[in-house]
Amino acid sequence: MIHAILKMGDPRLLRVAAPVERYDTPELRALIDDMFETMAHAQGVGLAAPQIGVDLQLVIFGFERNDRYPDAPAVPRTILCNPVIEPLSGEMEDGWEGCLSVPGLRGLVPRYRHIRYSGYDPAGQRIEREAEGFHARVVQHECDHLIGRLYPTRIRDLTKFGYTEVLFPEMDPNAD
């Protein structure tokens, strides 16, 4: 089932999500299926449960190709419960981000370039991976939703925040 995606200004996006405590349940599987369907419908590269009003530490991400980020390399399809992020260096990298909860806007956001992330899959099996570049950016962006943080709060230079159609006129206006 496709869910409505909460938009910036909705106070539910500012809450800290609760940990997933029960794995491998029909309810968790149904939620994950709904999240993937919602993400695909919105042409997203990731989605966090709080974005559809579910206060759980659950994120999904991954794509082969995405019209909203045409130059981005593929990111493996991942389901991550109770994620933890560890920067593997202090190197930060600025990159343009958008968000399904902040439609039509983009901002230049600093993120760690190289991270390790860990958590659990829907069956409760531990996941641990390293990521760099756009993959690392997507993981950090989605995990921010679990602590009630949206990407505009990370922007250092507000002259690098605006409407996608103004900042990137060459992009398809329906892509964001």
Swiss-Prot record:
Its cofactor is Fe(2+). GO terms for molecular function: metal ion binding; peptide deformylase activity. SUPFAM superfamilies: Peptide deformylase. It catalyses: N-terminal N-formyl-L-methionyl-[peptide] + H2O = N-terminal L-methionyl-[peptide] + formate. Fe cation binds at C99, H141, H145. Gene3D superfamilies: Peptide deformylase. Its EC number is 3.5.1.88. GO terms for biological process: co-translational protein modification; translation. Keywords: Hydrolase, Iron, Metal-binding, Protein biosynthesis. Binds 1 Fe(2+) ion. The active site is at E142. The keyword Iron applies. It comes from the Bacteria. It is an enzyme of class 3 (hydrolase). Belongs to the polypeptide deformylase family. Removes the formyl group from the N-terminal Met of newly synthesized proteins. Requires at least a dipeptide for an efficient rate of reaction. N-terminal L-methionine is a prerequisite for activity but the enzyme has broad specificity at other positions. This is Peptide deformylase 2. It comes from Bordetella bronchiseptica (strain ATCC BAA-588 / NCTC 13252 / RB50) (Alcaligenes bronchisepticus).
